Structures are given as C-alpha cells and as structure tokens.
Amino acid sequence: TRRSSDLYQKRNETNELFIPPGARLGDKVLEVSNLRKSYGDRVLIDDLSFSVPKGAIVGIIGPNGAGKSTLFRMMSGQEQPDSGTITLGETVKLASVDQFRDAMDNSKTVWEEVSGGLDIMKIGNTEMPSRAYVGRFNFKGVDQGKRVGELSGGERGRLHLAKLLQVGGNVLLLDEPTNDLDIETLRALENALLEFPGCAMVISHDRWFLD
C-alpha cells in the first residue's frame, strides 16, 4: 500500500547517520594513570587507571554526579585533575559531543547552523558541499530550511551531532548522545559507531544502546 511504502521510504531516509572519519590512529590511543579529581570535600574520581586500545568502543556508566562528564572534560583539557596523568597518543584528534543542546541559534535554519552559510565545508581533513554533509544527518531537501527553534528533540539531537562531529576526530567522546533521539536515529547512530574506524567513548544511561 501507499502508506506502507511511504513508511518504508521514511524509515530508510532516517536510517543513516554520518560520522566523518578522522586520521588513521596509531597504536597508542589513551592512557589514564592514577587520576584523582575532587570538588571541595567531595571526591569524584579516586586513583582511576585505564587504557583504551585502537578500535575500541568504551561505554561509561554510573549514577548522576559520579564524575563521568568531568572525566571527559579532563580528557579534552577543559579541566585539570588534582593528580594523575592523561596521555593521548600522537595521532589522536578528539571530537567531543556534550549533552547540552541549548547553544544553538533558534532563528537560523538547520543548514545555516551547521554550515555557517558556507557552500563548501571543511570536514576533518577534507572538504565537501555543506548541503551534502547536512543531508548525511537525515536533513533532506526542505528540512534543511527548517528553523532550529521549530525542531523536535530528536532533530535537535541530530543537528547537535552534525555541528560537533565536523572536526573529523578519530577518538569520539560522546556524552549522552542518545538523549531525545527516536528509535530509528538510535539505530542509525549505533550503526555509524560500529562502522567508525577510530575509537569512541560513550556516556549513556541507555543500556540497550550500549549493549
């Protein structure tokens, strides 16, 4: 029937998400040694050590306030640990996606918000037409002309990913990337991560997604 055909086409259209590949990773990716971080008397992270091998997808779970986002901020250099070390490999380029989606201009169109008005965008180390890049996040045709303020939660989530992934990192730090995403976009993100040639660290309360 026409309805089932339309639904099938819509499902196919939303079953795509593009994570731009970064430069090839070397053998050393990330090593954390004896990390400690506290705020006043409250210790968030105490003597944490781990390493991330090439090609790994690492899930980070824990209750709210446990220091998961703080760990990401230390890894990206936004905060400093009280003690311990975080060592990134020489080939590592981080791409961070935080959980805060308010820093977008509601008066701009989807295309303007991602492209800055440029017809050609630098995506990692390559260039591509901006409308093609935005389209890889399931904003097709007229959807690219939607105002940011009119978007649903799931659409804002896709827009957020499109903005922050364009740096073309080879190690992704994804903080609650599944918030507000619909089931088809969740599956598309899962597939994109599995196909991503670099590493990813994912903070999520969504155990189904992490599994």
Regions found by a protein language model. Give the residues of each.
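ABC ATP-binding cassette signature C-motif
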Residues: 22-211
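Short, small-residue-biased leader/transition segments that mark boundaries at the very start
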Residues: 1-4
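Short secondary-structure junctions and interdomain/linker hinges
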Residues: 6-7, 121
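ABC-family P-loop ATPase nucleotide-binding domain
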Residues: 7-31
